[in-house]
Structures are given as structure tokens and as C-alpha cells.
């Protein structure tokens, strides 16, 4: 490690590749070294090495998650760990469980689908005071599950992923769909496909949910949106998205927060993680 500050780029490249290959076990030593050095350029080299080690491990975990058809919660936690590598996952899991339990206590089998969603909205947005913020790429925290829960603020994607996780845990058939320029959720009719295999995908949707606020929309509202956008409402837009596609969309949108000269490498890394989730 004494060669980390070597001015010869070839020497530094060779040393850095070796250190990164050692994995996360090398991180404590790098952190200790950082504290003993006053040279800012060398400190930045160490910080980048630590980041590269985290990214290498995270890439491996994403591949494992994809290959094992992991759940949405774990995918969202992996995405958050890109920006917060020391994320304490148990804190997030405990918070999600509290919201799930309080919601479950208010649900019953006698409720209609809209009444069920009203219960979820009441607990998530009113009792827990979750707020929706407009889509912006100035603050990555609004995309990430840990910070969205901690600050009670999330954009449509940040809030939407938590909403999907809660519905999955509560056995409510709410899924993300791929409406252009929107992150919209849909309450699905689980019995539809068995009887209507050749119909338009929108026919399996009872109604739509805006994850920013929990507001529900009817089919005519979505039809009006497509008309306004001058886009044909193709059947593919209404198919439920797999967990991999939801996290892929999260990573792609999150990457736009780093579209500047200083952080452009982060944008590239997030897009490479997204590409790993391709079918």
C-alpha cells in the first residue's frame, strides 16, 4: 500500500488493481491509511479505491439477486447501497415491517380493491406522513429506500417502490406498469389472464395508483394522458413489470443525478448495473 501515492500512473494502476482484487477485507486498512495521510490527492485515490471495492462487490450481489429472482425489497436495498455502502439494512426492514403491520391490522377480506388501497394510503401517507416530491435529479435521496423512509420524502419512484413492497407483503395485486414518462402502479385483476389470454393488457387493470400521493385514476384518465402525449396505448405499456425491470428503471433514473463532470463515472457505473439486469 505504500505505492498508492506513486506518481507513476502505471505503478499506481498495477497497485490499485491488486488492492481492489482483495475485496472488502482491505477496506479497514485503506481507511486507516487515509487517516494517516494529509495529502489530498492521495486521500482521493484511497477514497476511489474504497469506492471501487464496494462497487465490485455490489456488482456481484446484483448478479446473484437477478439470477435468484430476488424480491423487490432486496433489489431496492442493493440500489441504495451504491450511494450508501454502509447502509444498515435492518433499520429499513424494521421500518417497512412497522408500516406493513399497521396496514395489515386495518385490512380485511371484506374490503373492495379501492377500499384496500385507501387503507394503504391512509397508513402510508397520513399516519406515517410520507410526502411526495416532484421528480428532480438534484437529490438522489428521493430515489433511495433508506432515505425515502428516513426523511418521509420520496419521488414517484422512491415512494412507488416502497408502496409496491408493502402491497407485495400484504398480498395485494398492485404492480408497476411502463407508462411512458411516468412511474404508475396498477391494481391488477388476478383472474383476468385465465379467461382473456388474447385481450389488451389494460383490461386486466382495475384502476391506477399515483405513488406520489396514492391518488387513484380510472382508465379514462390514462387514455386522456396517452392522447395528450400523442402516443398509441400499446398493450405492452400495461403489462406488470418484473422486479428486475423496476430496479433497472430505478438505476437508470438515479444515474441522471450524476450527469456532471465530477460524478460522470457514477452515472456510468449505475448504467452498467442496470445493464446487468437485462433479460
Segments from the language model and where they lie:
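A structural boundary/capping signal
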Residues: 1-279
Amino acid at each position: 500500500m505504500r505505492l498508492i501515492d506513486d506518481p507513476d500512473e502505471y505503478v499506481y494502476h498495477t497497485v490499485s488493481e491488486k488492492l481492489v482484487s482483495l475485496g472488502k477485507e482491505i477496506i479497514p486498512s485503506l481507511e486507516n491509511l487515509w487517516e494517516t495521510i494529509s495529502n489530498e490527492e492521495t486521500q482521493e485515490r484511497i477514497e476511489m479505491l474504497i469506492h471501487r471495492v464496494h462497487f465490485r462487490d455490489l456488482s456481484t450481489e446484483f448478479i446473484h439477486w437477478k439470477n435468484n429472482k430476488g424480491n423487490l425489497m432486496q433489489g431496492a436495498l442493493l440500489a441504495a447501497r451504491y450511494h450508501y455502502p454502509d447502509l444498515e439494512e435492518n433499520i429499513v426492514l424494521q421500518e417497512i415491517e412497522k408500516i406493513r403491520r399497521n396496514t395489515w391490522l386495518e385490512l380485511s377480506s371484506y374490503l373492495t380493491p379501492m377500499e384496500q388501497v385507501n387503507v394503504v394510503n391512509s397508513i402510508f401517507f397520513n399516519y406515517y406522513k410520507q410526502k411526495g416530491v416532484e421528480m428532480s435529479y438534484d437529490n438522489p435521496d428521493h430515489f433511495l429506500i433508506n432515505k425515502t423512509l428516513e426523511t418521509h420524502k420520496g419521488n414517484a419512484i422512491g415512494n412507488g417502490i416502497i408502496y409496491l413492497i408493502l402491497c407485495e407483503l400484504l398480498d395485494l395485486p398492485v404492480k408497476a406498469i411502463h407508462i411512458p414518462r411516468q412511474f404508475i402502479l396498477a391494481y391488477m385483476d388476478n383472474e383476468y389472464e385465465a379467461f382473456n389470454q388474447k385481450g389488451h393488457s389494460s383490461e386486466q387493470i382495475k384502476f391506477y395508483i399515483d405513488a406520489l400521493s396514492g391518488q387513484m385514476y380510472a382508465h379514462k384518465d390514462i387514455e386522456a394522458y396517452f392522447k395528450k402525449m400523442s402516443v398509441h396505448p400499446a398493450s405492452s405499456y400495461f403489462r406488470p413489470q418484473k422486479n428486475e425491470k423496476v430496479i433497472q428503471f430505478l438505476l437508470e433514473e438515479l444515474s441522471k443525478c450524476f450527469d456532471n463532470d465530477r460524478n460522470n463515472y457514477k452515472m456510468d457505473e449505475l448504467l452498467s448495473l442496470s445493464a446487468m439486469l437485462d433479460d
